[in-house]
């Protein structure tokens, strides 16, 4: 990102749209729907994390903050990527499959955490908030899945809509 000031103010919107939105066309627009055909949202997020984190490995060789931290950042990096993948899967599913929504979220995250003025504190706080958000997203979803299993076959759905085989 250190090259952005040299490109001028007009480069920022282009970077903003391509940095997050460009990636999300592949990760959430292409891969996620295919993974979710056979896996839960959480498992799909975990599988997507492997590819997504691998895609970002080159940053360890050119981003100054990554270079100074060395290999000790890798476990936290993968945990953060999993949290991010979980949040983006949730957002993608909640938005009806909007790649634009996840792309803008991703680009905003990149802007806050990767800008030269962000510093380590902004990146750390933002990443921590994403991890907390991931836990908040996953916990109720897993609990709802257990509750819905208790009601299976009764005709009562958590959505409030009638289910096949019974009425609300």
What are these regions (language model features)?
Residues 1-13, 65-79:
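Juxtamembrane helix-entry segments on the extracytoplasmic side of multipass membrane proteins
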Residues 138-156:
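Membrane-interface capping segments at transmembrane-helix boundaries
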Residues 22-49, 64, 93-98:
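Membrane-interface helix/loop boundary segments of multi-pass membrane proteins
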Residues 46, 70-130:
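Functionally important transmembrane alpha-helices
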Residues 16-21, 53, 77-82:
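Residue-level hotspots within the lipid-embedded alpha helices of multi-pass solute transporters
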Residues 53-66:
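Membrane-interface helix-cap regions at the ends of transmembrane helices
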Residues 151-168:
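Short, intrinsically disordered terminal tails adjacent to the first/last structured region
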Residues 126-144:
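Hydrophobic core of alpha-helical transmembrane segments in multi-pass integral membrane proteins
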């Amino acid at each position: 990102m250190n090259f952005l000031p040299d490109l001028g103010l007009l480069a920022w919107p282009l970077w903003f749209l391509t940095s997050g939105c460009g990636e999300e066309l592949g990760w959430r627009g292409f891969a996620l729907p295919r993974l979710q055909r056979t896996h839960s949202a959480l498992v799909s997020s975990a599988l997507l994390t492997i590819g997504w984190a691998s895609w970002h490995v080159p940053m360890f060789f050119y981003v100054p903050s990554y270079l100074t931290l060395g290999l000790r950042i890798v476990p936290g990096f993968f945990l953060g990527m999993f949290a991010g993948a979980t949040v983006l899967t949730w957002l993608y599913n909640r938005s009806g499959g909007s790649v634009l929504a996840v792309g803008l979220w991703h680009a905003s995250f990149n802007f806050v955490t990767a800008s030269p003025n962000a510093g380590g504190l902004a990146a750390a706080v933002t990443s921590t908030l994403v991890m907390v958000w991931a836990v908040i997203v996953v916990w109720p979803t897993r609990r709802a899945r257990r509750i819905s299993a208790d009601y299976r076959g009764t005709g009562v759905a958590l959505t409030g809509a009638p289910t096949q085989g019974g009425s609300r």
